[in-house]
Amino acid sequence: MKKAEFGQLPMPVQDYLLYLEAIKGHSELSVIEYASDLRTFFRYLAKEKDLYPPDTPDDQIDLRQINMEFIKTVTLSDAYQFLIYCKNQRGNAEATRARRVIAIRRFFIYLTDNRHLLEENPMKVLDAPKTKKALPKYMTLEEARHLLSVVDGKHKERDYAILTLLLNCGMRLSELVSIDYNDIKSNDTLVITGKGNKER
């Protein structure tokens, strides 16, 4: 999903996405993930609640017609059915379903606590599926040395520097590609802006 497509979402969702970026300070990528998860949820509901026939292709569902009156009809059971649909029909992994739960739950918190558009939050007790925490994969010192020793090619100095940063700092790829010349301080240190706009 692209930010330019936000105008195709229900107006309450559009307002929520603005709130996430302007007030909560979420990154554009995080806001796009919330938008995508909520779009999937409301497309599912549009078919389940008979706004559209069940066989309607997702891209032909006009979500702009979904308003607060429709949202007030959404129940906890609807969310559970949506998660079953995500697992069985969409083949979503536990982590994806857990992320979708967070998006739905936080959207309804916003409607209830921030905007006071709902008297009760139907998603208050919506739990995320348990996800398995995999141990991080790592290289041995010998493997890391070997990797650095085989760097070759036209941009070998650049590639060597990139690999050295990744190996020694444990930064994410997104953090690496977002490094700007101004991030390098006068004392030869580098400030990385990571997930959640946290500097380290």
State the predicted function of each range:
Residues 1-200:
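Conserved catalytic core of the tyrosine transesterase superfamily
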